[in-house]
Protein backbone atom coordinates (compact mmCIF):
# COMPACT_ATOMS: atom_id res chain seq x y z
CA UNK A 1 0.00 0.00 0.00
CA UNK A 2 1.25 3.46 -0.89
CA UNK A 3 1.17 6.02 1.92
CA UNK A 4 -0.81 9.20 1.26
CA UNK A 5 2.30 11.32 1.84
CA UNK A 6 4.62 9.26 -0.39
CA UNK A 7 5.76 10.48 -3.80
CA UNK A 8 7.12 8.72 -6.87
CA UNK A 9 10.15 10.17 -8.66
CA UNK A 10 10.51 8.77 -12.18
CA UNK A 11 14.10 9.09 -13.35
CA UNK A 12 14.98 9.83 -16.98
CA UNK A 13 12.51 7.76 -19.01
CA UNK A 14 13.79 9.42 -22.19
CA UNK A 15 14.29 8.58 -25.83
CA UNK A 16 18.08 8.78 -25.48
CA UNK A 17 17.98 5.81 -23.08
CA UNK A 18 15.26 3.89 -24.91
CA UNK A 19 16.12 3.97 -28.60
CA UNK A 20 19.07 1.65 -29.12
CA UNK A 21 18.81 1.99 -32.90
CA UNK A 22 20.64 5.33 -32.72
CA UNK A 23 21.67 5.99 -29.11
CA UNK A 24 24.82 4.47 -27.61
CA UNK A 25 23.38 5.40 -24.21
CA UNK A 26 20.26 3.29 -24.70
CA UNK A 27 19.54 0.06 -22.88
CA UNK A 28 20.65 -2.77 -25.19
CA UNK A 29 18.31 -4.74 -27.44
CA UNK A 30 15.22 -2.72 -26.57
CA UNK A 31 15.36 -3.90 -22.97
CA UNK A 32 14.24 -0.44 -21.82
CA UNK A 33 10.72 -1.26 -22.95
CA UNK A 34 10.51 -4.35 -20.76
CA UNK A 35 9.85 -1.90 -17.91
CA UNK A 36 7.01 -0.01 -19.63
CA UNK A 37 4.09 -1.93 -18.15
CA UNK A 38 5.43 -2.01 -14.59
CA UNK A 39 6.33 1.68 -14.76
CA UNK A 40 2.84 2.64 -15.99
CA UNK A 41 1.17 0.68 -13.17
CA UNK A 42 3.42 2.33 -10.61
CA UNK A 43 2.88 5.85 -11.97
CA UNK A 44 -0.90 5.38 -12.01
CA UNK A 45 -0.88 3.99 -8.47
CA UNK A 46 0.73 7.20 -7.16
CA UNK A 47 -1.85 9.41 -8.89
CA UNK A 48 -1.00 13.09 -8.57
CA UNK A 49 2.11 12.45 -6.45
CA UNK A 50 4.52 11.78 -9.32
CA UNK A 51 7.44 13.89 -10.55
CA UNK A 52 9.44 13.10 -13.68
CA UNK A 53 13.07 13.96 -14.34
CA UNK A 54 15.08 14.45 -17.51
CA UNK A 55 18.81 14.33 -17.97
CA UNK A 56 20.02 17.12 -20.27
CA UNK A 57 23.58 17.88 -21.30
CA UNK A 58 25.26 20.81 -19.57
CA UNK A 59 25.25 23.98 -21.64
CA UNK A 60 28.94 24.47 -21.00
CA UNK A 61 30.63 21.34 -19.60
CA UNK A 62 32.89 21.92 -16.62
CA UNK A 63 35.29 19.75 -14.62
CA UNK A 64 34.74 16.01 -15.20
CA UNK A 65 32.07 16.71 -17.83
CA UNK A 66 34.72 18.10 -20.20
CA UNK A 67 36.44 14.72 -20.51
CA UNK A 68 33.13 12.86 -20.40
CA UNK A 69 31.79 14.64 -23.47
CA UNK A 70 35.04 14.07 -25.37
CA UNK A 71 33.83 10.45 -25.50
CA UNK A 72 30.18 11.33 -26.15
CA UNK A 73 30.11 14.53 -28.26
CA UNK A 74 26.93 13.46 -30.08
CA UNK A 75 25.00 13.92 -26.82
CA UNK A 76 26.21 17.48 -26.19
CA UNK A 77 23.09 19.12 -27.60
CA UNK A 78 20.53 21.65 -26.41
CA UNK A 79 18.07 20.58 -23.69
CA UNK A 80 15.17 20.83 -26.13
CA UNK A 81 16.74 18.40 -28.60
CA UNK A 82 14.27 15.54 -29.26
CA UNK A 83 16.77 12.97 -27.98
CA UNK A 84 16.16 14.31 -24.48
CA UNK A 85 12.35 14.09 -24.78
CA UNK A 86 10.49 11.72 -22.52
CA UNK A 87 9.41 8.57 -24.34
CA UNK A 88 5.89 8.81 -25.78
CA UNK A 89 4.29 6.59 -23.13
CA UNK A 90 6.06 8.47 -20.35
CA UNK A 91 5.17 11.88 -21.80
CA UNK A 92 1.52 10.86 -21.85
CA UNK A 93 1.61 9.84 -18.18
CA UNK A 94 3.60 12.97 -17.27
CA UNK A 95 0.93 15.37 -18.51
CA UNK A 96 -0.03 17.65 -15.63
CA UNK A 97 2.96 16.60 -13.51
CA UNK A 98 6.19 18.44 -12.80
CA UNK A 99 9.15 17.56 -15.01
CA UNK A 100 12.55 18.45 -13.54
CA UNK A 101 15.50 18.76 -15.94
CA UNK A 102 19.05 18.40 -14.61
CA UNK A 103 22.47 18.37 -16.23
CA UNK A 104 23.80 15.94 -13.63
CA UNK A 105 23.31 12.21 -13.12
CA UNK A 106 21.86 12.75 -9.65
CA UNK A 107 18.59 14.65 -9.68
CA UNK A 108 18.30 15.51 -6.01
CA UNK A 109 18.31 19.22 -5.23
CA UNK A 110 16.06 22.12 -4.35
CA UNK A 111 14.01 21.95 -7.57
CA UNK A 112 13.14 18.29 -7.08
CA UNK A 113 12.53 18.80 -3.36
CA UNK A 114 10.08 21.59 -4.15
CA UNK A 115 8.38 19.49 -6.83
CA UNK A 116 7.65 16.73 -4.29
CA UNK A 117 6.55 19.37 -1.81
CA UNK A 118 9.24 18.42 0.69
CA UNK A 119 7.92 14.87 1.10
CA UNK A 120 9.97 12.63 3.37
CA UNK A 121 8.79 9.37 1.79
CA UNK A 122 9.69 8.78 -1.83
CA UNK A 123 9.91 5.88 -4.21
CA UNK A 124 12.42 6.23 -7.03
CA UNK A 125 12.15 4.29 -10.29
CA UNK A 126 14.02 4.29 -13.57
CA UNK A 127 15.80 2.01 -15.98
CA UNK A 128 19.55 2.56 -15.59
CA UNK A 129 19.76 1.97 -11.85
CA UNK A 130 23.58 1.94 -11.91
CA UNK A 131 23.70 5.59 -12.91
CA UNK A 132 20.99 8.22 -12.52
CA UNK A 133 18.65 6.27 -10.25
CA UNK A 134 21.41 5.33 -7.83
CA UNK A 135 22.91 8.82 -7.70
CA UNK A 136 19.53 10.40 -7.02
Which residues make up each language-model segment?
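Active-site acidic carboxylates
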Residues: 1-99
Amino acid sequence: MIAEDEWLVVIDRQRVFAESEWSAWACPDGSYHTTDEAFARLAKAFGDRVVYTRYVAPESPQNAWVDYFKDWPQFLVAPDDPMYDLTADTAELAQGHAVVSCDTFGKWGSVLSEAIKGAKKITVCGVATDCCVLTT
